[in-house]
Amino acid sequence: MSDRAYKRWSCGLLLTLLLVLGACAAVVYWVDPCFYYRMPKDRAPVFFSERYQTAGIVRNNAADVVLLGSSMTANYRGSKVGAVFGGTGLRLTIPDGYYSEFDEVMTLLMRTHPPERVLFALDANILTRSPAGVTGAMPDYLYDDDSLNDARYLLNKDTLYYSLYALMSQRWNAGETLDTGFMWDDTVWWNHMEALDEYERPEIAAVSMPAGALLADTAENLAVVTNWATRYPDVEFDLFFSPYSILYWDKIDRMGETDAVFAALELACKTLLPYENITLHGLLFDRDIIEQLDYYCDYVHHSAEAGELVLAKLSSGADRLTEENYRKTLANWRDFVVNYDYEKFWDEHYWYQFHTPNNS
């Protein structure tokens, strides 16, 4: 091949490549599957990945009250949050999220549309685990303020795939509203039988976990939250220990982790309560919720119905923890859970009360 022919071939190949890349970028920009530029106006949005789409939801939806959490908050409606606390509400979910991931969401939220109030779910399982376990699942380039990252969004095989997926889903009328996006309340059975069936009861541990075993990781996670309170003094933070079911307490008791978990919860109270713009709520200790297994589909996740009860209790302050009452609250709750009759859930009488016909 002559030099001239080679140059023509190279230029043709380069032009073809640029045209293909341009076409891909145009498709991604037009569909905008992650709502990076806008929320769709002419079609219902398609929700498929919380980590990819939360950044766009934050960028393009201002709200007075924002609920942020893991999958524990997935079945709350933003409209309910707004109705309870006043103003507009928005729910943001990062399933099995790490605190570094929540921090990315919070930073973007405060940079774009800072709300008056943030509700944040403190999941005991996530609060006490090592931050070092975080994966690379979070697309950081969608959350930063570097405009050069537009290219990473537009010229990305994942977002191109998501664009095609969104187009096909819209053809199948699979779009949802922002209020219901990522909700799965109607996909499972909320019932005591389901909760118990999904609960894998551990064997009793031969040795208990040391009381201080979870403190270092808990302190590192709490530092993320206290940094929010310091950086955003004009924002009210309503933090709450997520209401895992009573089966959670059976699990940590059998695993020998009771002392370690209570030490971590005490550290959380000591750390968070001194901040004037933080209010802390002990929903994890609320018997109205956690003992009602019909609210659950496993040992931790609760229904939208229970979520509405959580919002009402947050608003009323029914389970509020203070520097004056948290020690007594934790002591009383520890006494309650270590002496609880967990075996009743596997007793025939427990099942008969639900499944024996009333012949009276």
Located regions from the model:
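Hydrophobic membrane-insertion alpha-helices, especially the h-region
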Residues: 11-29
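Alpha-helical transmembrane signal-anchor/signal-peptide segments
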Residues: 30-51
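Short extracytoplasmic
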Residues: 46-73
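N-terminal post-signal-peptidase region of extra-cytosolic proteins
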Residues: 48-53, 98-105, 222
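Membrane-embedded segments
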Residues: 62, 68, 72-152
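Secreted/periplasmic serine-hydrolase-like ester/acetyl group-modifying domain
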Residues: 121-122, 131, 135-231, 327-360
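Conserved, well-ordered alpha-helix/loop/beta-strand core segments that scaffold catalytic motifs
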Residues: 193-275
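C-terminal regions of proteins
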Residues: 266-360
